[in-house]
Amino acid sequence: MKIVFTGGGTGGHVIPNLAIIAAVKKLAGHAQIFYLGSQDGLERKLAEKTGIEFYAIQTGKLRRYFDWQNAVDALRVPVGIVQALHRLIKIKPQVVFSKGGFVSVPVALAAALLRIPLIIHESDLSPGLATRLTARFAKKICLSFPTTHPGHKIQITGNPVRPIGSAEHGREFLDFGNDLPIVLIAGGSTGAVFLNLLLERSVFALAHKTNVVWLTGAGKLPKMDLPENVRLFDYLDQEYLDVLAAADLVVSRAGANALFEIAAASRPSVLIPLPAESSRGDQVENAKFFEKAGATMVMPQEKAKPHDFAKLVIWLLSDSARLAKIGAAAKNLAPSDAAERIAKIILDAAK
C-alpha cells in the first residue's frame, strides 16, 4: 500500500501530517509513505528528518491581496501540477492525503486528475483557500471543529497533534533553578512579528514575577540583553512538547495546530489572534470558539499593550484555580485519538 501526503508552508500544516503518518504506520506497518511538498519549506526538513521519502514540486502562494509576486506564483502552480502528476504516476499511490496550505493544491489537483482517492483535513473553524479549491474533489473531508453544514463527505475527527510531552523533562531542559511560574510565549514556526515586539517591551516586567520562555520564530532572535530567567529560542522541535507541558501559561497566536497542541496538554492560554484585517479571520474565529468554551482568554491585538499584557499574565499566574479550570476546558476540545481517526479514514480509502 502506497500513501502520498502533502501540505506545508508552516508547521501548522506539516506537524499534523507527521502525527497522522505515525498513526498510519502503527495501524499498517507495511504502508509505504511518500511526501510531496515545496523545495525550501519546513515540510522537507521535517519529513527527511523522520525518514520519509520526500519529493519537491513547484508551488505558488495563494494570496488574498494584490502583490506582484502573485503573477510569478500563478505560473508555478501549473508547473507544480505537472510535476505532481509525474510523481504520482511513478509512485502509483492508493490514496493521497492533503493537510492544506498552498503547497498542497498542485498535488490535490493532480490526484483528482488521476482519479486517486483524495482525503483532506481542515484545521480551522472556517475553511482555508486551499480547502475550498480542492474540497469538491475529495472523497472525505476531515474537520477539527464541529460544523453546521454536515454532509456525506464530512468527518469530525478533531485535530491531530504530537504526543504530549513531559513537564519534568521540560523543566530540566529549561533549567531555571527557581520556583517561579513559567510562561511560554510562542508565535508559531515562522514567528509572529507583533508578539516579538510585544515581548521586547514587556519581558522585563514579566521576568520580575515569572520565568519566561520566548519562541521568536526561525531567524528572528532579538539583539538585546535579557534577564537570566528568560530562555530565548528561535525554534524548538521535539523539545517544544516538553516545554509546553512544563508551562503554567501559554501565550500564542490562534492558529489551529498551536491551539490544539496547547489544549491536548491541558495548558491554560492567552490568545492574541492575528487580526481579521491581516488575514481571512480564521484565527479570530478559532479564538472565539475556544473562549466561548472557557478554554482560553483572548486579548485582541489592538488591546495588547505591553503594560496591560504583562499585568494580565501576572494576574492569571496568581490564580491557580482559574488556570486549572481553563486548562481542563481546553482539554475537552482536543480528542486524543484524532490522528488515529484520520489514519483509519485514509486506510479505508486505500482499500
PLM features: what roles do these ranges have?
Residues A112-E168:
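Active-site-proximal region of nucleotide-activated glycan assembly enzymes
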Residues S336-K351:
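C-terminal alpha-helical cap of glycosyltransferases
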Residues P93-V95, A245-F260, R267-P268:
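Acidic donor-binding loop of glycosyltransferase active sites
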Residues R322-S336:
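A short, well-ordered alpha-helix in the C-terminal region of glycosyltransferases
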Residues I3-G8, H30-R76, Q83, T157, ...:
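Conserved nucleotide-sugar phosphate-binding/catalytic loop shared by glycosyltransferases and other
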Residues I52, I116-P117, D248-L249, S266-L274, ...:
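Structural loop-to-beta junction motif characteristic of Rossmann-like glycosyltransferase folds
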Residues Q83-V96, V105-I119, R132-F137:
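Glycosyltransferases and closely related glycan-assembly transferases
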Residues G41, L46, T50, H169, ...:
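Donor-nucleotide binding loops and adjacent catalytic segments primarily
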